[in-house]
Amino acid sequence: MKKITLILCATILCSVASAQYRPDVLGAKFEQLTIDQPDGKDGEKIVTTLVRHTPLEEVSRAVLYVHGYNDYFFQEEMAAKFIEQGWQFYAVDLHRYGRSMREWHTPFAVSNIEEYFEDIDAAIDQMEAEGMEQIILMGHSTGGLTTPLYCHANRKALRVDALILNSPFFDMNLSSGFAESVGSPFVSFMGSIFKNWAVQKGKETPGGYGRSISDKYDGEWPFDTQFKRVESLPITAEWFRAIHRAHRKLQKGLDIPCPILVLYSDKTISGEYDKELYMSGDAVLDVKDIAKYAAGIGSNVTQIEVAGGIHDLVLSRPEVRYPLYDQIFEWLEF
């Protein structure tokens, strides 16, 4: 029986390691792997997509990047920076996002943030099968909410050696204390009953943040606007409930055993769109919330406030993001 078990395990590992990558939309330096997941509700077919930069030879340390809401992996420069520093680079497009979106999916739909744990596990399984022995998990925005919860849930057998959070979504950025203390719990409760209720309507015109980063408007960065909309989609009560419940869990404190680096802008900005303004601060989250809750997610947390950083810090202006990379790689020498 033991021999049969070993043979089965070896067969599974060989199958995973030999999985077929194919060319990625980002071009010659990237390739992608589609990983089938268990069917979703009502038999919905679900997949995860793992993207990797052309691998370095004989390197067994790697970064796994997890994107945010209304997002996917497109940050080629970030991948190149890690490669230059001797890190393999991988990114995951979560189910119902980006490369993992299928025509029958509702974009970004989720009822519990923990649904994304399967995407992360599948990515790490594949990375380990490819020989990765040291893995740094990196999450941005909603990915920066999912990844610490993942690390906490798996803390007794964590396969992650460090966690980097880029403007993590630790709390709702609402207009008043009443909205946060009364409105959020109410909408969250209603989300258990009226799941498709649109608590926030979408906008057909580009938002300020989208305009500030897209090369089709005032920004520097090319990305697929079908995968990352510059306008906003409606937010459902079910999605709001999933986020609210995740926030409550994180805000009570986590016990993540690995070193954590939390990065955020020095200021939150809002108001009518102005190019200079929107390129100088976080137009999505309240950075004070990030600073408030960061210290409570583990025992080894480093916080860095990034002057002039925008919401996705690695998309900030060159004079902001290049020194930021230096800080990240210096921290990774732990």
Where in this protein do the model-derived segments appear?
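Short beta-to-alpha linker loops that shape the active-site pocket of alpha/beta-hydrolase fold enzymes
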Residues: Y69, D93-G98, F169, A307-I310
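N-terminal cap/lid segment of alpha/beta-hydrolase-fold proteins
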Residues: Q20-E57
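Serine-hydrolase catalytic core
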Residues: V199-V301, E305
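Conserved alpha/beta-hydrolase
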Residues: D71-F74, A79, I83-E103
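Short beta-strand element of the alpha/beta-hydrolase
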Residues: S60-G68
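Catalytic active-site module of serine/aspartate enzymes centered on a nucleophile-bearing elbow/loop
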Residues: N300-F334
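Alpha/beta-hydrolase-fold enzymes
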Residues: T142, T146-I235
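Catalytic nucleophile-loop/oxyanion-hole region of alpha/beta-hydrolase
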Residues: Y69-N70, G98-Q134, V320-R321
